[in-house]
A protein has these predicted regions:
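Short hydrophobic/aromatic beta-strand micro-patches
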Residues: 41-43
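Active-site beta-strand termini and strand-to-loop segments that position acidic
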Residues: 82-84
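Switch/connector loops and helix/strand junctions flanking conserved nucleotide-binding motifs
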Residues: 98-100
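Catalytic metal-binding acidic patch
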Residues: 37-39
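Polybasic/polar functional segments that serve as interface/processing modules
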Residues: 1-35, 47-80, 94-95, 105-117
């Protein structure tokens, strides 16, 4: 993991945390996927909170010099994906997160903490 990727993970995690994102989880998938190196998953209580989490994350990532390759979902979505290349961020409603259960799908990845970065 290089310093740029570490900064990306820290920046995204901190922005999600600042907007009171719940159950923020970092999964290292670099040994099992060519899609990305890390997934960051977070839950929000409602669409307003999800939107605020996404907006602040994009703002903080841009301030750090990172631009998203793609954003899937919109202000009315209960699952928004932000693709930053090495880091892909998923912000869900609690219900969508439980339903899609990405933690199970990526269970061969390594769960990490903010302190690892």
């Amino acid at each position: 993991m290089n310093d740029i990727t570490k900064l990306m993970v820290r920046t995204a995690y901190d922005a999600l945390d600042e907007k009171l994102g719940q159950d923020i989880e970092i999964i290292d998938i670099q040994n099992i996927s060519v899609i990305s190196d890390y997934l960051i998953l977070a839950s929000g209580n409602n669409m307003n909170q999800i939107s605020a989490m996404v907006d602040l994350t994009n703002e903080k990532m841009a301030e750090a010099g990172f631009r998203s390759r793609r954003i899937e979902g919109n202000k009315n979505s209960t699952w928004i994906l932000m693709d930053y290349g090495d880091v892909v961020i998923h912000v869900f409603s609690k219900e969508d997160r439980a339903f899609y259960d990405l933690e199970r799908i990526w269970r061969d990845g390594v769960t990490m903490t903010r302190d690892d970065f």
